[in-house]
Amino acid sequence: PDTNTNTESCENTSIDNLQKCDLKHDNLDRYYYIYIPENLDNNSSIPVLFALHGYGSSAYRHFSYTNYIPIADSNNLVIIYPQGATTDTLSSHWNVGGWTSKSTVKDIEFIDTLINFTKNKIMIDETRIYSSGMSNGGYMSYHLACNLGEKFAAIASITGSMTNGTYDDCSPSHPTPVLQIHGLLDYVVPYDGNAGSKSIPDVIDYWVNYNSCSSDPDRLIKYSNDFDLILYDTYINCLN
């Protein structure tokens, strides 16, 4: 039997312009939040940003601390906050293989379904769909670029990485701009990688090579004192 539905049920929340939508996907009850600016200009390009929470977190918590509302309001931007699934072995998560390999949740298809729902009710610019994610959500952003790349223009990963499986099987459909934000002292997703994740330099090298960027970055020291150093590397002359 068909375990997906072609309909969703949305309701307003206590926050202006934020709706919660429920649907069934692959026989699982799933939901997401969608923020649609009150003064959305339907006569101009409407980009969409997927904002993906970290492992064990939630869509609403991610909405609360990312504070994307001012960005959405000033850029005619629709933001979607999907909720990861919970299974018998995993808390709320995104199935990216590797350390989530016990999961059977079809998250790539779930995100694709949300794109279809969104474009059926809003005249979005399908060439300007983006994904950003925190930790496990960052892994998922890379997973989407590798496996649903035809739908995503660019992605961002904050403290995420690529699992070995995502890295080895990555098949992007076009040169893809990537933003990676990471701390050298991150012990949850180590900068130098571990048995289940690629190192951040390996991840950056993959996309630099795939996008045919200059191999040496332009480096800007954004902040420095006796205790901290923030480096901002930009790879230029890329294909996209």
Where are these regions (language model features)?
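Short, proline-enriched alpha-helix->beta-strand connector loops that line the catalytic pocket
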Residues: 173-178, 238-240
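A domain-start/cap signature at the N-terminus of enzymes
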Residues: 1-48, 63, 74, 103, ...
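Alpha/beta-hydrolase active-site loop
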Residues: 100-122, 143
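Cap/lid segment of the alpha/beta-hydrolase catalytic domain
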Residues: 83-106
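Conserved alpha/beta-hydrolase "acid-adjacent" motif
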Residues: 187-199
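Alpha/beta-hydrolase fold nucleophile elbow
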Residues: 123-135
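Short substrate-entry loop that stabilizes the transition state in hydrolases
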Residues: 40-90, 164-165, 188-190
